[in-house]
Amino acid sequence: MDMKRRDFLKMTAALAAAGVSPSLLTAGKEQFTVYGAPAMPSVTIAVTALQGKLAKQADVSLKIWRSPDQLRAGVASGQFKVMMSPSNVGVNLRNQGQKVGMVNILTNGITQLVCKGSAIASPQDLVGKKILVPFKNDMPDIVLQALLKKLKIDAHKVSITYAATPPEAVGLFPSKGYHAVILPEPMATASLLKGKTIGINVVHGFDLVKAWGQAF
């Protein structure tokens, strides 16, 4: 989906506002909280909460979880009743005995490789590079590790540094000696825009979805 910078900033601002507001609608209805991921699909949830049929029946609020660990804890405690989740987390929670079910796959292909200077054109070109990745042992780290293994690329030859969250990765990427960062939207676009504002050439690398499809 093509998006102008102004539209992106509006959507990001709306998502941020939804994450901190106690409610997206007026009070007086049944409280209904959806816990969204720190990624572009939560914008869809925010719009749906405002304009969808559910909004007529419940006081819908959207809160954003910061990490998969927070998501797991929220489900285990019973606090999270309706939430967005990486597909692997949902499956693992179910296998662990949690009473959760997946309604649908909301989106795919939103995880991007963003590079500093020149684009990294293929997975093989990651060798010798310093890569910044959020959420160790979760998406997108699982995707990267599986891709390297499938293509028989020695993971020890790729220098991987982990950030706690995508926003933290966006902040670290320009000022450190990283060649690339793996980010979900809208954080990938935020990284590109930040590069422009501070005079650093930040570009898209190879298509992770295409590389995955070719490998598997």
Each language-model region and where it sits:
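Flexible hinge/capping segments at coil-to-helix
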Residues: 116-131
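Short helix-initiation/N-cap motifs at beta->coil->alpha
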Residues: 63-73, 86, 158-172, 186
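Short, polar/charged alpha-helical segment
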Residues: 38-65, 69-70, 74-76, 92-96, ...
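A structural signal for short loop-to-beta-strand junctions that line the ligand-binding cleft
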Residues: 32-36, 98-105, 129-132, 199-203
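Short, well-ordered beta-strand elements
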Residues: 29-41, 58-63, 128-132, 161
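Alpha-to-beta junction loops
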Residues: 76-85, 98-99, 129-130, 174-183, ...
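Pocket-lining segment of extracytoplasmic ligand-binding domains
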Residues: 88-89, 168-216
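N-terminal export signals
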Residues: 7-26
